Amino acid sequence: MRTLIVIPARQGSWRFPDKPLTLIMGMPMIEHVYRRSCLVSNVDKVVLAICEEKLEEACHKLQMEYVMTDREQPTAIDRVGEAARSLGYTGHDDIVINVQGDEPAVPPPVIEFVSELLLKYPDVGCANPVERITDKTELDNPHRIKAVLSNNERLIYLTRQSIPSSEFDIDNEATFYRQTCVMSFRGDFLQKFCLMPQTNLELVEGIDMLRLIQNDYPIACSIIDDATYPVDVLDDIKTIENVFQNDKWIPKYNIIKK
């Protein structure tokens, strides 16, 4: 079994242009993601999946491995699939982990957990954990993708709206979850994903994982206790800077996987 971590990154985000190279404590965001990914145990390779010369120049300067991909890839997962394909990680026993390029504070144990979750279910081709929503303002934030999961550790649905509905929840018993933007795929299943046409729910919600849900493919899903802090808008940088004040992973960034 081989494990590959791919970090998709793109400069042309309409919500936050030039986001990957935004400095956080003097270091570009994607470098934080890359260095943290390199701290994950039992990983054979870590690469960035990019499509722009500016990011390629940054990768050279910062000594980060990368794969150039097609600018026209429709989603981050499709870009990850192209990178995995070019590196030969397409077998059933290959594990490809997608760590989004806007997750600068992702704890390495979360990435390890996503791989373990996939291996727990031999009949499943993809795994994507969730975390509890403790700040109820996130329910109205369309950048935070809300999730519903089954009692059997399967992802039922993803949406940018508040879910489940709390209109009848007079005792405040509802528990809310959001997607963690780290997911794992078996190598052959990731290529199968890339061959599927985008679905209408995927396009309406702007959530690529709905391609699997709408085509009835199970997604292993479990709750993590570690918090992640995605960067969707410029104001999120302040949150990351606060988190980094007590971060234990930054001092370990000098450990690099080849």
Predicted features and spans:
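Conserved core of the sugar-phosphate nucleotidyltransferase
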Residues: 106-196
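Short, high-confidence coil segments that cap the C-terminus of an alpha-helix
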Residues: 43, 91-93, 121-124, 217
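Short phosphate-binding loop-to-helix
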Residues: 53-116
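Hydrophobic/aromatic residues located in beta-strands of well-ordered beta-sheets
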Residues: 5, 46-48, 96, 127, ...
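N-terminal glycine-rich phosphate-binding loop and ensuing alpha1 helix
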Residues: 2-50
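A conserved hydrophobic position in a structured secondary element of the catalytic/binding core
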Residues: 50-51, 101, 106, 185, ...
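Short, acidic/turn-prone active-site loops that include or flank metal/cofactor-
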Residues: 11, 70-76, 226-228
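Conserved alpha/beta core of the MobA/IspD/sugar-nucleotide pyrophosphorylase nucleotidyltransferase superfamily
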Residues: 174-258
